[in-house]
Amino acid sequence: MRELAARGYFVLCLAVGRFLRSARYSTARVVDQDGERRVRKRRLFYAPLLIWMGRLLVRILDTGVRVLPQREWEERERLIYRSLHGTSIRLDADNVLVLPVLAGRTLATLLEDPELGESFRKKAIERAVVALAEFHRLGFTHGDAMAENVLIDLAAGPLDAGAAHWFDFETVHDSRRPMAWRRADDVRALIVTSLVRTVPEKRAETLEFMLDVYADEDVTRVLTTSFTSVWRRSLTFHLAQAALSFQCFREIGRLLRARSPRSS
């Protein structure tokens, strides 16, 4: 009976998560501006209402993240682009952020490409994890570190020299949460959004590879707690990021628990 209840709760969270995922706060388009290609990103007119409504929702779901209002979002984008790329971004008079165009394709797009060879898949995942670890070492966390939010440029030199660029910094972690928790939440988001685009027989290997590349057992221990039980309020938000099956969720938890003795 408890197993049936757990599956029912999981399905409910999955359905609500899909609804949450349909919400959009902004739009972005690439334009030619002053002889250069730029990304113009603007908030949708109803975004302030969504953000206001979301404040209560994120507390109820215990997500540990929030979507930033306009001014805080602008400041965060400016700070991160300056830190990562040594470049400034402009704010147009109509509250449009003008960002540089970053090279590459999203990791999500690459992993969904049936023509992409296994070595390139592995290198793309590795580049994303390495870039996330470097981002964390700079003192930042992402807040929505999905495969959809990292660009992989495998053409940036030889295969071993491919580059990855994280983008879309509208979401921020609750600063009251421990740093290990915030980093683990980013790693979780990247792992699950990669695994849902990986064939089942390769998921265990891919999970192990990503954790080995990130190489922080303290973060792995915190990450494991996200998969100990389905009875977590944050599950709805997590399934909004990646629509895992009940079996996949359980399998990830089993693999993480099996890995935990390595830290002893």
Report each predicted region and the residues it spans:
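Conserved structural core of kinase catalytic domains
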Residues: 63, 67-125
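Catalytic-loop of the protein kinase fold
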Residues: 137-147
